Each structure stands twice: as C-alpha cells, then as structure tokens.
Curated annotation (Swiss-Prot):
Function: Essential for piliation.
Membrane topology value: Multi-pass membrane protein
Higher taxonomy: Bacteria, Pseudomonadati, Pseudomonadota, Gammaproteobacteria, Pasteurellales
Keyword Transmembrane on entry: yes
Protein name according to UniProt: Outer membrane usher protein HifC
Keywords: Cell outer membrane, Disulfide bond, Fimbrium biogenesis, Membrane, Signal, Transmembrane, Transmembrane beta strand, Transport
GO molecular function term, any single one: fimbrial usher porin activity
GO cellular component: cell outer membrane
InterPro entries named in the record: Fimb_usher, Fimbrial_membr_usher_CS, FimD_plug_dom, PapC-like_C, PapC-like_C_sf, PapC_N, PapC_N_sf
Length: 837
C-alpha cells in the first residue's frame, strides 16, 4: 500500500463533495453520462431518479407517526429488487416504536432472521417518508390503525438500564472560629455513593465528623472521629410491578401514615413509571359527540387540551396534572358549527388520584433509628386508589409485636373545594408496665381556589389525637426506656392533642401579594396552647423589590409572647448584581443588615456576597463569601468577624467521582439518575445541559441529573473542541431508568482527509457512488469518480473497510488500511479492494 500526503485544491475538493451527493431532488432525471456512462460497473443510477433517494445502510432518525414524535432509533435501508431502489426495512425495533394495531401490519419481521421485510410490504396502508437532511422518518397512516396511548407514553422495553459504573458524591466543609478566649475547628464530610451492575443499583449514604476546641488556658477538647451510617440498600425497578424492590437499610416512603427507618424489604409503586400525562391528579373527561367534533378543554380561561373525536362516546384520560386548581370547561364543537359545553370540577389541593390508578407500598423488617437497628420487627402496608373523578380512598396498616395501627381516609373533589379526611386507630402495648393503650387520631383538611378574584388559595387543616393515641416511634421509644431503666415511671413525651392550621394567599395584581397564616397546637402532657400568626406582603416599586413580614407567637403555659417584624429591600445593580438591605425587630432586639451580592463569569460560574450588620446594642459584624462552579464540582469560602473579636473561616467543596468504562471522571454532585458522556478527542466541548459542564482531557463529562422514564436530550456544543474534530451527531436521546447511569457515546473523528484510490482485482476502478463502512457498520465515506473513496469519517487508525455497490457478494469488496489520524494533511493511498472468491 502506497501512502502520499499532498494539499488538495479547495475548488476540486468542493466539486468532489457535490458529485458524491447521493440524493436527487424533485423529479430530475439523473444523467449517468456525467459519471462515465457505460464504463461504470454495476451501478443502477435509476435509483436516484426519485425524490429523497437513499443508499442502502443504517441511519439514525427521529420517528414520527401522524406528526407525533415517537423517539430516536436506528433504521435500515436495503435494496428492493422489485423497485430497483433502497427501501426501508421493517425491523422489530421499528415495529415496537410505531405502536400500530395488529390489523395495520400484514407482514411482521422475524427477530431471528436478518432478511429485510420492506416497510411498504409490511404496512401497505401507511406512507413512509424519510427526510435524510433532517434525519426524520415520518409515517402517515389512518388514525384508527394506531394504538391510542397516553401523551408522553414510552414502552417499558425502551427504558434503558444504563452502564455498569460506580460513583461517590462528596460534600466537605471545614469550619474554624475563635476569639481571644477559645478556638474551635470542625470538619464534616458527607458521602453518597453507589455501584450499578445490570438492573441493580447499590446505594449508601453517610457522614464523617470531627471537632476540636482549645481554650486560652491550654485545655483542649478533641472530639472523637465519628462516621454515621445512613441508608445502605440494593434496588431495582420492575415494569410489571410499576414500581421497585428495595433490600437493605432504607426509610419507608408512604404518603399517608407514619414513615420510619427499616432494615428489610420494600416493594413500592413509582408514579414516574407512568406517562407524564398520567402522573398526579387530573379528572377523566367523558362525553358524546354527535358528529366528527372538535373537543376543547379549558381551565381558568386557557385551552389546555384539544382533540378531534369521531361521532359517539369519547373518553379523555391523558390530561396533564395541573399546578393550578380551577374547574374544567369542556367545549364540543360539532361539524355543523354548533357548540355545547359542560363543567368538570377540579382541584389539585387534595390527595387525589386518577380514576383506576393505584399507589402502594409493602415494607417489612427491623426498626431503625439513625444508624441503629433494633430487634422490633415491623410490617407496613399502604394503599391509595382513585375510585372516581371525585373520590380517592386511602388506607394503611402497621403491625409490630407490641403495636398495631390502621388508617382509613379519603380525598374528595367537589365544586366548592377539595376535602380530605382520615382516621387512625392505634393499639400500643407496654409489657414491662403490663399496660396497653387504645387510641385514635382524626385529621381533616379543606382547600379551595378562587381564581376569579386573583388566585386566592385557602387551606385549613385540623388534627385531634386522643390521650391514649401513640405512634410507632412513641411506643418503641418508651419500651426501650422501660428496659433500660427498670421500674421507671411512664415518662412524659409531649404527645400532640389538638393541631389547627390555616393559610391564605392572595394576589392583589399591581398592588402585590398578601399571605396570611396561623396555627395553634397543644399537648396532653402540657398546659396551655401555643399559637403562631404570620402576615407577609411583597411588591415592587419600579425596580425596587420590597417585602414586610409580621409574626407573633404565644405560649400560654409560660405567658411568653414574641412579636417580630422583618422588612427587606432589594435593588438590582445591573445584570446579575443587586444590593439588599433588611431591618428586623424581635422583642427589644433590633438588627440591620446591608449587603451586595451577584454572579459573574462567562457562564455565571462565580458568585459572591458581602454583608455588614449591626444591632441596637452596638454589636457589629462583617462577612463575605465567594463560590465557584465548574465541571468537576463547586467550591466555596467565607470569612466573618465582629466587634467582639470573634472570627470565623470556612472552606467547602462538593462534587462527585465517577468510575466507568472510559476511566474516572470528576463531576458536579450527581442526582438519582445521571449520564456519562464520551466523545473521543473532543476535550473542551461544552455540554448543552445548563450545568456549566465541559468535556475533560479524555473526552468525558457527566450530566449530573437526568429524568427517569422520560426522553432526555443530551447535547454537545463542539465550538470549543479542536477545529478538526467532527461529530457524527451533536445530540442523543436517552430514556433512563430510575437510579441508572447512562453512557452516551458521541462518535467523533479527527476529520482526517484520506483518499483511497481503489481498484478491483481485474484492474477496473471500484464503481462510483459505492459506499464504505467500517467493521461495525458505520458509514465512513463515498466512492467518487475514478474509484476514489473519500473517507473523512474514520474513527480508528487501522482496520478493515467494506465497500458496497449492491447487496450481492459480487457487488462488494474489502480492504485493510492503516492511516495517521493525527496528520492534518490529505493522505492518499493506492489500494486493491478484494472481492469474494
């Protein structure tokens, strides 16, 4: 193999690219004489006489059915002898994504056979349109042949497990303070990490702390180094359960009843596995259309849903959960123009579920408090069910050897507001005291939203617990106390008796916002009632923002009454900078503060704050802080001093270390699910995540948060990568499972200019318009006039390439190559391409 390096004339190079374009537009006839006429071997140029012609091969495309996006997938085109051109293959993966009725498909693909089943034969009633320039594949088919799914539905088979990897989140904070009399130091390290292997995720969290105090007299108090274990569990999800299974140390996650720590097993539903339009509460809308009609659903004057339905009964059950309350107005516009409407009551303020939806949890194991595990074995079951548009039922059972509790309740949606109520019965046993207690607790709440007068929200909640009502934590704690202090009397633990809360927020338009709240509560073991009130008002005057907060708390047992007032002002000082001031008074104490804060940097990666304060007793303090965020974490520092000669300094850093198949990557702290990006040779390219992340020296980066069971778009902005790095694509789709670590590979090339002058064993040049693929089936270039393969998508310095001008073995050849991908000059190689014997 000969190798030559030479500069290529730019005009000739551009002409080569144009001639290599395989697509002919509109109905233009392809003139084969421009390519040498009959001297070209085996190429049927008639394939390019159709619009958007495409060569055989594998392509990436966004899939659409009747203009509804279904997701991203690889698609395959193969030569169809019946039509003389490459046509779309109907693969099992494509069949799954299209989500069509069985009667729409007359010929199904065979997952065990690579034979191409052409989509035009498999779905004769559909019309496919592949738009190569936009990388889109569109199918138009009668709506009756599609399976109606909730909006945003993603088949569980498309959920991605992710890659095997390990990570550790860390949060380190060092604090030092002192004055002439005493000095102290403390160190805190918070950890949360895990390992993913297959469908399982192992997670652990804990913290390490130490401190040291030293007085001016020389006395030193060194605290013990202490590591506190939190949760340690193994978890995976199951589509069949619409939930997950957790084994180990964890906290129960019931939305009703009591939550606590366990060492054991939990099976619980996960609402995130539902389509986005099925999460939260929204009513099912039912109606009847007399003709082919347009149905519009409005809330608070805005159209939130619209669909065309055929004549007859219709059901709409995929409304997105709204963040606002307000009845739904359903308008039916018939084909003759007549419009009729009806109202569906709706409030999102009660614990409501959609009709037919179920939320559950079953947990059992040994009781845990902090990092301690006790002998008491606990079993808990929780069930919530949406019975109708207006009624949701809630229930919970809790069982241990010395404690039982049962809860039953409901959420009710009505035109005059949302109600919820529940009753809990408890039976607590204290064996060492030979005493058992039976009690109950009643809870009720009411909420309503008056949108007509400016989004006025009222919320009231009341709970009453009888004298003999004990929670699980009360019972276990008391029994442990009795065992530790034999013969001790029944200690006081301050169990709630009455609790009442009310709050109201009111938008006043241009006059600002008003918020009122109040609560009162008392205990069986204490006399008197504690009461708290709060009034808050906020508004702006031109660019000045201001707020006032008044509060009062009353303890009738001690007769203590605390009144406080807080006033704050904030004034913008240009982009991302502001000055703020506050005044507060509590009793006889008055404090004033003045500060400046903001952010700066190309991506606002730096932030700062400077404050000065004083009180009415002559005390003054000054403090400042600075923080920085980048791809590998966040860093913070602060300093303060006051008029009493107290000084303090703190330093902090938080981030994550992620180990994966491409190495070890430093990152910002990661969430439950996150993604690893790998793009070879693309160091410096920015990640389009809004998280101030760039690819490191090795072409790796971490997107710290992804949304499970949803389509996530992971993108790269290549502008800061080396100029000769070429991306096959700059955006990918992933659909991660909960707790998954996704690996997103972006194929890149150094855009090395390599020309292979290919000849066949008989001395003829390889046919023009042939395509070349690497051993993995990836496209690397086209053959132009004279058998020249322009290969600008090589990803490996050596390997084997396959050149095709048809699907038969006699219409293919292969050759091995070795090039220098770091060479910026054009490389030219003379090679004989070997055909099958």
């Amino acid at each position: 193999m000969k190798t030559k390096n030479f500069p290529l004339n730019k005009i000739a190079f551009a002409c080569t690219l144009l001639l290599a374009n395989p697509v002919a537009w509109a109905e233009d006839q392809f003139d084969a004489s421009l390519w040498g006429g009959g001297s070209v071997l085996g190429i049927d140029f008639a394939r390019f006489n159709v619009k958007n012609a495409v060569l055989p091969g594998r392509y990436e495309a966004q899939i659409y059915v009747n203009n509804e996006e279904k997701g991203e997938s690889d698609i395959i085109f193969a030569d169809n002898p019946a039509t003389g051109r490459a046509e779309l293959c109907f693969t099992p993966k494509l069949q799954e994504m299209l989500d069509l009725m069985d009667e729409a498909i007359v010929k199904s693909p065979n997952s065990e056979d690579d034979t191409c089943v052409f989509a035009s034969d498999a779905i004769p009633k559909g019309t496919f349109d592949y738009q190569g320039g936009d990388m889109k594949l569109k199918l138009e088919i009668p709506q009756a042949l599609t399976i109606r799914r909730p909006r945003g539905y993603i088949a569980p088979s498309r959920w991605q497990t992710g890659t095997n990897a390990a990570f550790a989140n860390y949060d380190i904070n060092y604090y030092r303070s002192g004055n002439p009399e005493v000095k102290s130091e403390s160190l805190y390290v918070g950890l949360r990490g895990g390992v993913n292997f297959g469908n399982w995720a192992l997670r652990h969290n804990g913290s390490f702390s130490r401190f040291e105090n030293q007085s001016s007299s020389g006395f030193t108090d060194k605290g013990k180094n202490h590591y506190e274990r939190g949760d340690t569990y193994l978890q995976r999800d199951f589509a069949l359960l619409r939930g997950n299974v957790t084994v180990g140390d964890f906290f129960s996650t019931a939305r009703i009843g009591e939550n606590f720590g366990l060492r054991g097993l939990r099976i619980a539903s996960d609402d995130r596995m539902l389509a986005p339009s099925q999460r939260g509460f929204a009513p099912v809308v039912r109606g009847v259309a007399n003709t082919n009609a347009k149905v519009s659903i409005k809330q608070n004057g805005y159209t939130i849903y619209q669909i065309t339905v055929p004549a007859g009964p219709f059901v709409i059950n995929d409304l997105y959960a709204s963040g606002y309350s307000g009845d739904l107005t359903v308008e039916i516009q018939e084909s003759d123009g007549k419009v009729r409407s009806f109202i569906v009551p709706f409030s999102n303020l009660a614990p409501l579920m959609r009709v037919g939806h179920l939320r559950y949890q079953l947990a059992g194991g040994r009781y845990r408090i902090d990092s301690r595990t006790f002998d008491e074995r606990v079993l808990q079951g929780v069930l919530q069910y949406g019975l109708t548009n207006h009624l949701t039922l809630n229930s919970s059972l809790l069982y241990t050897r010395h404690y039982r509790a049962g809860l039953f309740g409901f959420g009710l949606n009505t035109p005059i507001g949302a109600f919820s109520a529940d009753a809990t019965w408890s039976h607590a046993e204290f064996p060492l005291k030979k005493v058992s207690k039976n009690g109950y607790s009643l809870h009720g709440s009411y909420s309503i939203n008056f949108n007509e007068i400016g989004t006025n929200l009222t919320l009231a909640a009341y709970r009453y617990s009888s004298r003999d009502f004990y929670t699980l934590s009360d019972t276990i704690g008391l029994n442990r106390t009795f065992r530790q202090f034999s013969g001790a009397y029944l200690p006081e633990i301050y169990r709630p008796k009455n609790q009442f809360q009310v709050s109201l927020s009111q938008s006043l338009g241009n006059w600002g916002n008003l918020y009122l709240s109040g609560q009162t509560y008392n205990y069986w073991e204490k006399r008197g009632t504690n009461t708290q009130y709060q009034v808050a008002y906020s508004n702006s005057f031109h660019i000045l923002n201001y707020s006032v907060n008044l509060s009062q708390s009353i303890d009738k047992e001690t007769g203590k009454r605390d009144n406080s007032i807080y006033l704050s002002l904030s004034l913008p000082l240009g982009d991302n900078h502001s000055a703020d001031s506050s005044y507060s008074r509590s009793g006889n104490d008055i404090n004033q503060r003045l500060g400046v804060n903001g952010s700066f940097g190309e991506r606002h990666q730096w932030s700062y704050g400077i404050n000065a304060s004083r009180n009415n007793q002559g005390y003054r303090s000054y403090d400042g802080n600075l923080s920085h965020n980048n791809s590998i974490g966040s860093y913070r520092a602060s300093y303060s001093r006051d008029s009493l000669k107290n000084r303090s300094t703190s330093l902090g850093v938080s981030g994550a270390v992620v180990a994966h198949k491409y190495g070890i990557t430093l990152s910002q702290p990661v969430g439950e699910s996150f993604a690893i990006i790998h793009a070879k040779d693309a160091a410096g390219a920015k990640v389009e995540s809004g998280a101030n992340v760039s690819l490191d020296y090795f072409g790796n980066a971490v997107v710290p948060y992804t949304s499970p069971y949803e389509i996530n778009y992971i993108g790269i902005n290549p502008s800061d990568a080396e100029a000769n790095v070429e991306f096959e694509a700059t955006e990918r789709q992933i659909i991660p499972r909960a707790n998954s670590i996704s690996l997103v590979d972006f194929r890149t090339g150094k855009n090395t200019m390599v020309l292979f002058n290919l000849t066949l064993p008989n001395g003829e040049p390889v046919p023009m318009a042939s395509t070349a693929q690497d051993s993995e089936g990836a496209f690397v270039g086209d053959v132009v006039q004279g058998g020249v393969l322009f290969a600008n998508k090589l990803t490996q310095p050596k390997g084997e390439l396959i050149v095709k001008w048809g699907e038969r073995e006699s219409e293919q050849c292969r050759f091995h190559y070795q090039v220098d991908l770091d060479n910026a000059q054009i490389q030219n190689h003379d090679i004989q391409c070997k055909t099958a014997e």
